[in-house]
Amino acid sequence: MQQQKTLISEAARPKMIAKTALLIVSNPNHIGKILPSLTKQVNKTLYIQLLSALSSPLGSFCPEIFNVWPKFTQTISGIYAQTLQFEDLDVRVLLSGLKYKNVEYIKTRQPIDLVVFDKCYPEDDITNFIKTRIPSITDSYSILLGDSGEFEEPTVDATRDYNVYKHSVLGGTFDRLHTAHKLLLTEAALRATEKVTVGVTVENMLGSKTLWELIEPLENRINGVKDFLEDINPEIIHNVVPISDMYGPAKDDPTMDVIVVSSETERGGVKVNEMRCKCGLQPLKIVTVDLINDPNPSPHEEIKVSSSTRRIRTLGKVIQAITPKAHLTEKPYIIGLTGGICSGKSGVGRRLAELGAYHIDCDKVAHFVYEPGKPAYNKIVETFGKEVVGENGEINRKEIGAIVFKDPKQLQKLNSIVWPAIVEEVQERIRKSNADVVVMEAAILLGAGWNKHCHEVWATVIPPDVALQRLQERNKLSLEDAKSRLAAQIDNKKYIEAANVVFYSLWDTETTKKQVDKAWELLLERIKCINT
């Protein structure tokens, strides 16, 4: 792709990375020739409008081929498939200008900073097109001209059913809206003349999914679906609702005509129809959308494009905005590392130490502050009596454990002595270290409120059943004792809610190591930005 140098005015040339771009496509089978350069010019949203020529009215793209809306499916799927390499870019193929012949403008919910054409047009045509057809254009917009090569006529699968209905329905989790979701939602919109209903699963249906704790909140997922549908086809009604079973409103809504499913969930469509028949309703026409393969699946990721894979790819990355803490100095940069029992904290801490961090294990610090002569030692003896002191003069941790774990008030007394002593010792070690990055590993980081001493919180999580098995094997515990220990800690979801970065140590050590290495590399980039 090259920037127009003679036809486009200096004011219209790209000056910076655009937030949102609109790509006018006349040759949809070959947009892959343009995308690599285009994605360097835009960082958030890419709208795509099919249009044979700038002078053509919207709704007239290859009319001899696309004489009914659903026939666009194959071409639109091909467009999305060509964008799979650029998963950080939110690509949206607009439908209004394809479905309706009376649409005058290309409407988008986001203002357009950059307009891209897949072939060269005269300057006057470009200027007139932008002024008259794109109402959401910004004042400081830029223009790029690309070359998608020789035109290849789109094709349509003659064996498919292309009927259109009043009311379509589909359901799913819709976590981290991705290309496969967009294909399903697009199919539902192309099939509907009046209304699309989307059921979005609530939390009680998510437990079996990989890294389900990282699934976006229901409200976010519902809003994501609404936003997409309102962008690509605002003319129809969008009814996006939570569902707590596999049927949702499809089981008893007589106005629905067609259900859109993936090839993986086709059986679900059959079950919905079985339920409708029990309710005395007509079965829905089932339209199946093929799964789309991920171009670069890694071990432990699914071959298909999926939300599970996208969640896995967030591991080691910032998942929650980092809030600056005015009371903390820029150096050292302190990471609070926490997580449940047997979740892999220590392994992550050791790897961070290998990479250059100063690693402080607060559990070992706790042992240190219990030692005779330390401030915590004297206070513990004063509070709990000499009976907690062993024959060797040291605190008998089992003895004091038997006291405090039966009585929350006694536990609170112990914590009020030990926790401040640990923090004081940790801070003293940090002062002496002169380190750039400190990792403060503590299972009780959140419960003790120590996250206030950290620039970021990193958490390790593991499925509860795996943690249970690891704990039994490591500590030689009975099933009941292991369950009791796990029940006493906060759950994975709370760790994730508090964390800026998350690790998942379910798989082999090398996979966890890669997560940590990625997190370290990104951390150094953040610190560099802070210091410049």
State what each model feature region is.
Residues 364-435:
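ATP-dependent small-molecule kinase phosphotransfer cores
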Residues 222, 377-381, 464-472, 479, ...:
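An amphipathic alpha-helix signature
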